[in-house]
């Protein structure tokens, strides 16, 4: 104990000393002096012990000197070190926090024992503290067993949720079933209020009802004509509402599935739907927001379920393009908060009995796309794309917020690796936990952040997702649990309390990659949660057994799901074939995705078929005209009525008549009087990786399906009594209603009390404005209604996130664009209602094309006219508010009074009952009314301004892509003139200058053109703002309509014309001339003044001029031209002079670079004119050659506003009418557009017009095509083959399993054994590309993007890539590895997402699915490739070891006879070759039948070997280009003469030597075509060097190598080459020849020079430097590469020879699987030589390194990039090269082919020879 006490006292003394040192060095100097004095007095400092053991006290100064190695802050350093050291042993609870004051696991005194988890006994669990169970300690261990918890609850009647249900329980949730129930992506899923039913809403326009407990498909709700954007179930569980991109809301009764209402109050897509929790008697509200910037509140009665069709409507659109995209009700329903794209949050209040807007919160700086009210209070959280979220609460008469910045990082955690990759943080989703204590935000860096909702403090960062997260779903009663899902296919269950992952699920779809999860919901009881994905699946998760789900099929569709519907005037639907409401049809049959019926055991799962007999469960099958099996009707005993038989027979006859047509009409003609002729529901293209052009059987079943049996009255009564979704029990419903009522009253009370409280003093700019409820009842239509508008919010979003536009056009609301010109919405502009309605009418040029708009949605402006006509559009949803009805009636009266005004030019909306679904038919009706009133059809003819074919300066004719200056003053004058003359109805208040700030002149770009039939014909333009400096779009636009009117000056001026005039300087008195009516008129400038004083800088009509005839007028500078010296003046003053043809040509537009492609305009026009001439000779184009005969078709001009034809286009091309090729293509498309407008869809002439248009467009785009006939033939064959393929696909009979295989591309590339072929990846990638080309999703990515159609593509995408380019590169063999191919394919997907970042677009979804599909398949290819590399590496090492082991044990007697028989290998006859860029041509030499004599002895030619393959000398010499990439040349000395009597093989070698002889110095050293006789004679004089080197590459007699040399620099100091000697083991003799250095030796150099001087080298002297040289340098130094030759064998060094080899053969043979290196590295040394890369120089110091195993990473790189290595048998003792693949016999043959083997020469010049005894001893190598 005394020792311990002594040790403690010593530590205490040292601590006092360190404290004093620390204080003395810090700011507490006085405290330090006091401490030093006190410790000295009490002798508390460390003591000194002398040699006798006595202790002596020390002073402080003495200790400082003694411990001078200690820094003053030594104590602080100790404290710094303690924490990390302890952390390694016992980790603390919060990593990264360093403190000396912590407790528990943060304490520096913690031990393993103190950190152990506490476990309570049963008595502690049963205890109560303040009437409730006590809190568990922080270090509480695993939760107690459920038995202990239940027993404690039984004793005390209380429990804590974390004890009763620990989060570990959620690990037992598993996926019960994944069901394919839709053909497209499913963005919406929700549970009913009981949790027993699941609803899914998909892009295939269907809403389906599923049973939660067993996964059965119970019902399908049909009626929508576009994608489902949002769904909501009311709190009473009696009805479901679904919003769609067709601008309608459909409401169904959940009990019977009967439709209750079709609500039409929006003019654009529905973005969110919410049933209000508000309870005010039986009065309830349904709210809806739309992309048109409006919010509607629909009043309905809870008792009768009747909905008022006239909503209370608020238009929140301060500028065009603003969309309301999300909404959320408070718990009591008294508040509704909405988010929109104008960054404003709007709050509505219901406390007064009617909805009223109370606040507009403009604190976010980007769009607010996620919003959510808390579960129990009046707080809500908003998430924005500006990277922040805000928690709002109403206090002191204003909404106050807590800022949550997504850039915040938690203390102690380093997230830089993730967050640094994201340039701008964006909130993608927000949510509350169940108790509202925390707010969860999803960020675009794939993380979730958990915040304290009261303080805004960041609590946790949850990481686990690999892509953006758009689904956050809190548990319904457990505040610790959150579900999240995203586009990465992961569904993760989180523990919010601990910030850890509980369980994750990955939605992997076999053969298709992963499916992005688009929505997720949890059932009210928390027992299940359901997810939907991008491939149409419903995923059901839950606790317990999955046995019930095993009884259902994996694919569940009803055979009637996609049958066509007919609509009445109110948009209610009937099944077209049965003429019955869908909910009254007989129970359908269950089929798979191909339309094949499921077995009878599955049919019993259909409601209504549970008790059917077996024969009634077997559907009657038929075959459609396309060969598809389909369900005809159920097999019933009742007889078919005669009327049914007749109808069925007539329908079959009609189907037979239609079957000859390629396109089936989309319109359905009905015989029922109450049903108007409407369009069939057009389903979006199927999603999923199906073959291109293939249609799912279940979707195709409606094409010719006979009518099912008509239900009897008894059936109708029975079906009307069925209950699909049960209502809530009375007790539960009343209890929930009471709770909601109480919450509502509480919210009103809180709001009223806060309203009375005084403001706190806040800065003026922070005050939140409040706006009255009458704020914005004037509403504006959106600039377009996109079919792909998929942004919708529940309290959170169910569809993908809104688009992101990082380009300058950030404000462009592309989702609302439906025109093919790529509309751009003004940032601060507007457009009138009638203009927008006209812009989107069927007669316009802006017909919808979903594919087209997907590509251009976020890319800016597209200059192309429409490609396709839409499927017949449903009627436009109109407002039905009282105020709008009043204004509508007045406007209708006004229109009736003005008989000359066109019907579609009404200022107000049209009554739903009077407006026809087709705008085209409405126009025909209007024409009929007008002709009855005395108007003639001639008045409907378009003016010459439209039909003119000659380009004119005035009037201005707009063309697509024109850059123009817009002059507001001129437009105002036009509007005033049109109103004054009552030409047509025009509302000046809705002109663009009332909607936005317009300067006197604006630079614009024409991005949309359409012509409108009427009196007069109007031109509707869409103009986008241009930046005059950059020439790029700034993001704003507006629309306008006008026509050429006499006495109205053009207010649109071409930019080129304006720029030319701007730089002219006109002075008063200057003479000018101007073009008016194709003639020159002359005048004089009198003065200059602005037209209007408010626009002093405007050039519009700023000059006062006097014409020569005396008239005065105001003129603009661009209308005036300088008078040239050679001008022709009129004979009489005041008259005009006609323009000449030359003058006309000089005044027309001069095209800019690229506007006509790569060719000049004249050349392109002549080429296209020639093509049109050829096209006009074809029969298919006969209908479009000349203008339509108006005598035969008098109504044509009343339907078609802009007539055109091939002859008109040709004439305009000849006159250079078109200013750019996009303008021409726009008009070409109008041929098809006009044909489609006037004729019935699907008619032969419409198909012909489409073919002619596509043919001509292809011809125009291909600027290398000068003959259109071959293109016509190929397109015709393609059309025929496509139709045949479709029929062939449909004709495949068989079971559902077989048909599934036939219709689906193979999902697995291979099911074979592991391949170890390094080149196998090429075949696998080729199969994968073929598979991708079969997928429909790959269609946009198969060919390069057409830059004419998407001119801004290269502005956004730096490196375009497509699958055709990838395939060509692969076939050409330009990919070195599958990693390179993988990089290019991933570039395709990244380009797609960059150009079309809108996550709701079809292109984006296709990219997601195809990317997942590719990644799944390429992973196996990459794995096989790496496995093959590893296998080859291991195999190489094994062979080396085996050869060493065998060589060490070979008997010497095996080679006792050096004269043994030599083997002559059979020549290889492989003839494939590939020529590199550096190849040198060779000349073929006929073979000579002579035998080679080597060293005086006739021998067979020895076989030259490569590193891994046998080398065969081909006796047949053919002309082959040499591949210099493989050729490395060496300077060697050889025999140059041919000796008669030698063998063919030796002759071949002889010829190769002769061909490789260099010419004279004046000639190229690489010219193999001629022989150099002088060089030959020279070399014959020299004594042959009796040494042999093996070739490092495979030689052939026909492929001759270049020469390269390795020179060893000796003692010479000059840069010239010096003579040397053959260096063998340090000895020299003959003039040096180039010798490749072998392992274990330094390089030996042989150099031929003209000098006879011989410089000897000392034994063992090492070379100083190595040099790489160019062939030219060799030639300049008179060093000639010598011919390739097989030299005699030597026991020491073998000269390595190289020959040019075919590249493909080299790739096949080389061990590394890689082409030879093509780069030659150069260094500056004394001599310029070439070092062969195929032979590696080894030294003694590194000879053992090769024998050591190489790790896999090094091996991978070596095999990919390095050349073969040469090795030696003797490991440095001798330098005889060998290859490790050589067999023992081959090595002996190579080594001992001659008895007179030499070692070169000694230092004295004597030849060193190997004796017989030594030669026999060498056999054991």
Swiss-Prot record:
Instruction: Give the GO molecular function terms.
Output: insulin receptor binding; lysine-acetylated histone binding
Tell me which residues bear Phosphoserine: 136, 641, 659, 674, 677, 683, 692, 879-881, 911, 1281, 1283, 1296, 1315, 1405, 1479, 1525, 1560, 1651, 1762, 1783
- Modified positions (Phosphothreonine) are 1359
Q: Where is this region: Mediates interaction with IRS1?
A: 924-1129
Q: Which residues carry this modification: N6-acetyllysine?
A: 1497, 1533
Q: Where is the composition biased (Low complexity)?
A: 665-679, 841-854, 1447-1457
Residue ranges, compositional bias (Polar residues): 1470-1483, 1555-1576
What changing residue 110 to S does, per the record, is: In CHUJANS; uncertain significance
Q: List residues of cross-link (Glycyl lysine isopeptide (Lys-Gly) (interchain with G-Cter in SUMO1)).
A: 1470
Q: Where in the cell is it found?
A: Nucleus
Pfam families attached here?
Answer: Bromodomain, BRWD1_N, BRWD_AD, WD40
- The answer, when asked if Plastid is one of the entry's keywords, is no
Residue ranges, annotated region (Disordered) = 658-689, 751-927, 1280-1310, 1435-1507, 1555-1597, 1623-1646, 1751-1784
Q: What is its main location?
A: nucleus
**The organism sits in which domain of life?**
Eukaryota
Residue stretches of biased makeup (Basic residues)? 912-924, 1297-1310, 1435-1446
**Expression sites (tissue/organ):** Expressed in myeloma and epidermoid carcinoma cell lines.
What cellular component terms from Gene Ontology apply here? Answer: nucleus
Task: Tell me what disease the record lists for it.
Answer: Chung-Jansen syndrome: An autosomal dominant disorder characterized by developmental delay, intellectual disability, autistic features, anxiety, hypotonia, obesity, and dysmorphic features.
* Described purpose of this protein according to its UniProt entry: Probable regulator of the insulin and insulin-like growth factor signaling pathways. Stimulates cell proliferation through regulation of cyclin transcription and has an anti-apoptotic activity through AKT1 phosphorylation and activation. Plays a role in the regulation of cell morphology and cytoskeletal organization.
Subunit details = Interacts with IRS1 and IRS2. Interacts (via bromo domain) with acetylated lysine residues on histone H1.4, histone H3 and H4 (in vitro).
> Which protein, by its recorded name, is this?
PH-interacting protein
Q: What organism does this protein naturally occur in?
A: Homo sapiens (Human)
């Amino acid at each position: 104990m005394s020792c311990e006490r002594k040790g403690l006292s010593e530590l205490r003394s040292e601590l006092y000393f360190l404290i004093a040192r620390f204080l003395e060095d810090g700011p507490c100097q006085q405290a330090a002096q006091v401490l030093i004095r006190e410790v000295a007095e009490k002798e508390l400092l460390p003591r000194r012990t002398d040699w006798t053991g006595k202790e002596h006290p020390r002073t402080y100064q003495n200790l400082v000197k003694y411990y001078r190695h200690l820094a003053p802050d030594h104590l602080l350093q100790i404290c710094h070190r303690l924490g990390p050291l302890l952390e390694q042993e016992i980790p603390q609870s919060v990593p990264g926090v360093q403190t000396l004051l912590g407790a528990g696991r943060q304490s520096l005194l913690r031990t393993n024992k103190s950190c152990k988890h506490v476990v309570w006994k049963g008595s502690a669990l049963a205890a109560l503290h303040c009437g409730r169970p006590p809190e568990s300690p922080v270090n509480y261990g695993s939760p107690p067993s459920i038995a202990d918890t239940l027993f404690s609850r039984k004793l005390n009647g209380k429990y804590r949720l974390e004890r009763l249900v620990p989060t570990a329980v959620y690990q037992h949730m598993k996926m019960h079933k994944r069901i394919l129930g839709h053909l497209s992506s499913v963005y919406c899923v929700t549970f009913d209020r009981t949790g027993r039913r699941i609803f899914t809403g998909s892009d295939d326009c269907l809403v389906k009802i599923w049973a939660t407990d067993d996964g059965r498909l119970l019902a399908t709700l049909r009626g929508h004509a576009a994608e489902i954007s949002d769904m909501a179930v009311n709190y009473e569980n009696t009805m479901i509402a679904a919003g769609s991109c067709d601008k309608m809301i459909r409401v169904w009764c959940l009990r019977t599935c009967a439709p209750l209402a079709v609500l039409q109050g929006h003019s654009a897509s529905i973005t969110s739907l919410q049933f209000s929790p508000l309870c005010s008697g039986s009065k309830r509200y349904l709210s809806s927001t739309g992309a048109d910037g409006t919010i509607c509140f629909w009043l309905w009665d809870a008792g009768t379920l009747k909905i008022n069709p006239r909503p209370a409507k608020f238009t929140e659109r301060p500028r065009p393009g603003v969309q309301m995209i999300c909404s959320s009700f408070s718990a009591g329903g008294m508040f509704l908060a909405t988010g929109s794209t104008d960054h404003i949050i709007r709050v509505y209040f219901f406390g007064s009995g009617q909805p009223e807007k109370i606040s507009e919160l403009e604190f976010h700086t980007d769009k607010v796309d996620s919003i959510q009210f808390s579960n129990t209070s009046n707080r809500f959280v908003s998430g924005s794309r500006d990277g922040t979220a805000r928690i709002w609460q109403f206090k002191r008469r204003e909404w106050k917020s807590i800022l949550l910045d997504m850039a915040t990082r938690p203390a102690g955690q380093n997230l830089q690796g993730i967050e640094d990759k994201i340039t701008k943080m964006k909130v993608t989703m927000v949510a509350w936990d169940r108790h509202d204590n925390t707010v969860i935000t999803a960020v675009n860096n794939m993380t979730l952040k958990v915040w304290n909702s009261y303080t805004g403090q960041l609590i946790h960062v949850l990481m686990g997702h690999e892509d953006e997260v758009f689904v956050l779903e809190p548990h319904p009663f457990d505040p610790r649990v959150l579900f999240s899902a995203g586009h990465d296919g992961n569904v993760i269950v989180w523990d919010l309390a601990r910030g850890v992952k509980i369980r994750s699920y990955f939605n992997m779809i076999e053969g298709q990659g992963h499916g992005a999860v688009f929505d997720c919901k949890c059932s009210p009881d928390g027992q299940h949660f359901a997810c939907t994905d991008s491939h149409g699946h419903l995923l059901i998760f839950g606790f317990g057994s999955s046995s019930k789900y095993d009884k259902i099929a994996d694919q569940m569709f009803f055979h009637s799901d996609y049958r066509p519907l007919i609509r009445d005037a109110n948009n209610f639907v009937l099944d077209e074939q049965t003429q019955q409401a869908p909910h009254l049809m007989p129970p359908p049959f269950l089929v798979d995705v191909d339309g094949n019926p499921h077995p009878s055991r599955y049919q019993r799962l259909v409601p209504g078929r549970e008790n059917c007999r077996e024969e009634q469960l077997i559907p009657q099958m038929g075959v459609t005209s396309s060969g598809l099996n389909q369900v005809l009707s159920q097999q019933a005993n009742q007889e078919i009525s005669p009327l049914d038989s007749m109808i069925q027979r007539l329908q079959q006859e009609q189907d037979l008549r239609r079957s000859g047509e390629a396109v089936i009409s989309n319109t359905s003609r009905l015989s029922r009087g109450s049903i108007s002729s409407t369009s069939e529901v057009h389903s979006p293209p199927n999603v999923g990786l199906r073959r291109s052009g293939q249609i799912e059987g279940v979707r195709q079943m409606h094409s010719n399906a006979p009518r099912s049996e008509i239900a009897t009255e008894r059936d109708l009564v029975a079906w009307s009594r069925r209950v699909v979704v049960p209502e809530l029990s009375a007790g539960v419903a009343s209890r929930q209603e009471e709770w909601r009522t109480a919450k509502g009253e509480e919210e009103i009370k809180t709001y009223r009390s806060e309203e009375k409280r005084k403001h706190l003093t806040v800065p003026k700019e922070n005050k939140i404005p409040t706006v009255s409820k009458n704020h914005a009842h004037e509403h504006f239509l959106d600039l377009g209604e996109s079919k792909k508008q998929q942004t919708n919010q529940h309290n959170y979003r169910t569809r993908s996130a809104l688009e992101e536009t990082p380009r300058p056009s950030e404000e462009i609301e592309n989702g609302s664009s439906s025109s093919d010109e790529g509309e751009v919405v003004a940032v601060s502009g507007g457009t009138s209602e009638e203009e927008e309605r006209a812009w989107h009418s069927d007669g316009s040029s802006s017909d919808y094309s979903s594919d087209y708009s997907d590509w251009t949605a976020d890319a800016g402006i597209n200059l192309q006219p429409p490609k396709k006509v839409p499927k017949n559009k449903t009627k436009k949803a109109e407002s039905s508010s009282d105020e709008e009805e009043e204004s509508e009636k007045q406007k209708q009266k006004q229109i009736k009074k003005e008989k000359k005004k066109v019907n579609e030019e009404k200022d107000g909306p049209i009554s739903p009952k009077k407006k026809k679904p087709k705008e085209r038919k409405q126009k025909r009706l209007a024409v009929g009314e007008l002709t009855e009133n005395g108007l003639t059809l001639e008045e409907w003819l378009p003016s010459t301004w439209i039909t003119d074919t000659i380009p004119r300066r005035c009037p201005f004719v707009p063309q697509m892509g024109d850059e123009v200056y817009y002059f507001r003053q001129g437009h105002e004058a036009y509007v005033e003139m049109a109103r004054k003359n009552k030409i047509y109805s025009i509302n000046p208040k809705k002109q663009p200058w009332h909607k936005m700030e317009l300067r006197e002149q604006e630079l614009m770009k024409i991005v949309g053109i359409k012509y409108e039939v009427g009196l007069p014909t109007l031109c509707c333009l869409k103009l986008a703002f241009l930046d005059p400096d950059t020439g790029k779009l700034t993001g704003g636009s507006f629309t306008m309509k006008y026509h050429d009117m006499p006495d109205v000056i053009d207010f649109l001026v071409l930019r080129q014309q304006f720029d030319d005039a701007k730089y002219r300087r006109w002075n008063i008195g200057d003479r000018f001339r101007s073009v008016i009516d194709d003639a020159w008129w002359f005048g004089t400038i009198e003065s200059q003044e602005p037209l209007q004083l408010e626009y002093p800088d405007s050039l519009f009509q700023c000059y006062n001029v006097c014409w020569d005839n005396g008239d005065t007028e105001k003129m603009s500078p661009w209308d005036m031209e300088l008078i040239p010296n050679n001008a022709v003046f009129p004979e009489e003053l005041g008259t005009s002079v006609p323009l000449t043809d030359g003058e006309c040509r000089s005044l027309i537009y001069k095209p800019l670079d690229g506007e006509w492609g790569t060719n000049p305009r004249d050349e392109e026009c002549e080429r296209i004119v020639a093509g049109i001439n050829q096209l006009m000779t074809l029969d298919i184009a006969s209908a479009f050659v000349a203008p339509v005969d108006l005598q035969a078709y008098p109504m044509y001009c009343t339907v078609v506003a802009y007539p055109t034809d091939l002859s008109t286009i040709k004439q305009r091309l000849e006159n250079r009418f078109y200013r750019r090729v996009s303008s021409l293509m726009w008009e070409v498309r109008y041929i098809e557009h006009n044909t489609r407008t006037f004729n019935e869809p699907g008619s032969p002439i419409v198909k012909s017009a489409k073919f002619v248009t596509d043919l001509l467009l292809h011809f125009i785009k291909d600027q290398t095509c000068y003959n259109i006939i071959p293109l016509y033939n190929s397109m015709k064959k393609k059309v025929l083959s496509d139709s045949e393929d479709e029929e062939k696909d449909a004709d495949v009979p068989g079971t559902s399993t077989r048909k599934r295989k036939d219709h689906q591309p193979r999902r697995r590339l291979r099911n074979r054994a592991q391949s170890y072929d390094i080149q196998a990846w090429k075949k696998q990638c080729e199969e994968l590309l073929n598979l991708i080309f079969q997928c429909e999703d790959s269609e946009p990515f198969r060919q390069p993007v057409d830059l004419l159609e998407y001119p801004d593509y290269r502005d956004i995408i730096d490196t375009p890539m497509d699958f055709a380019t990838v395939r060509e590169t692969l076939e050409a063999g330009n990919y070195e590895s599958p990693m390179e191919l993988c990089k290019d394919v991933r570039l395709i997907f990244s380009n797609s997402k960059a150009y079309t970042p809108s996550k709701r677009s079809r292109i984006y979804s296709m990219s997601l699915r195809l990317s997942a599909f590719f990644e799944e398949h390429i992973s196996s290819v990459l794995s096989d490739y790496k496995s093959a590399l590893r296998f080859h590496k291991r195999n190489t090492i094994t062979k080396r070891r085996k050869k060493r082991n065998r060589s060490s044990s070979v008997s010497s007697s095996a080679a006792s006879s050096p004269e043994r028989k030599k083997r002559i290998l059979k020549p290889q006859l492989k003839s494939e070759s590939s020529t590199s860029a550096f190849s040198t041509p060779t000349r073929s030499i006929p073979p000579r039948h002579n035998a080679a004599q080597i060293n005086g002895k006739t021998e067979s030619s020895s076989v030259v070997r490569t590193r891994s393959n046998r080398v065969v000398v081909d006796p047949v010499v053919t002309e082959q280009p040499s591949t210099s990439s493989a050729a490395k040349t060496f300077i060697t000395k050889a025999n140059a003469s041919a000796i008669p009597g030698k063998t063919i093989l030796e002759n071949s070698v002889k010829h190769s030597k002769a061909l490789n002889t260099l010419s004279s110095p004046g000639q190229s050293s690489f010219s193999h075509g001629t022989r150099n006789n002088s060089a030959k004679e020279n070399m014959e004089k020299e004594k042959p060097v009796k040494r042999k080197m093996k070739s490092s590459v495979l030689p052939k007699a026909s492929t001759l190598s270049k020469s390269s040399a390795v020179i060893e620099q000796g003692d010479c100091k000059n840069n010239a080459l010096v003579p040397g000697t053959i260096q063998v083991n340090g000895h020299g003799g003959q003039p040096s020849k180039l010798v490749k250095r072998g392992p274990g030796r330094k390089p030996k150099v042989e150099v031929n020079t003209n000098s006879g001087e011989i410089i000897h080298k000392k034994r063992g002297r090492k070379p100083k430097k190595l040099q790489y040289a160019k062939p030219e340098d060799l030639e300049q130094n008179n060093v000639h590469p010598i011919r390739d030759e097989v030299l005699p064998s030597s026991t020491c060094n073998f000269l390595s020879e190289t020959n040019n080899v075919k590249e493909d053969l080299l790739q096949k043979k080389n061990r590394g699987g890689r082409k030879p290196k093509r780069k030659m590295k150069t260094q500056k040394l004394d001599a310029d030589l070439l070092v062969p890369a195929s032979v590696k120089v080894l030294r003694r110091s590194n000879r053992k390194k090769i024998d050591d195993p190489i790790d896999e990473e090094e091996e991978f790189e070596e095999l990919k990039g390095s050349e073969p290595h040469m090795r030696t048998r003797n490991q440095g003792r001798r330098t005889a090269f060998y290859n490790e693949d050589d067999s023992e016999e081959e090595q002996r043959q190579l080594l001992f082919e001659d008895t007179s083997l030499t070692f070169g020469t000694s230092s004295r010049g004597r030849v060193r020879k190997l004796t017989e005894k030594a030669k026999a001893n060498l056999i054991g190598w």
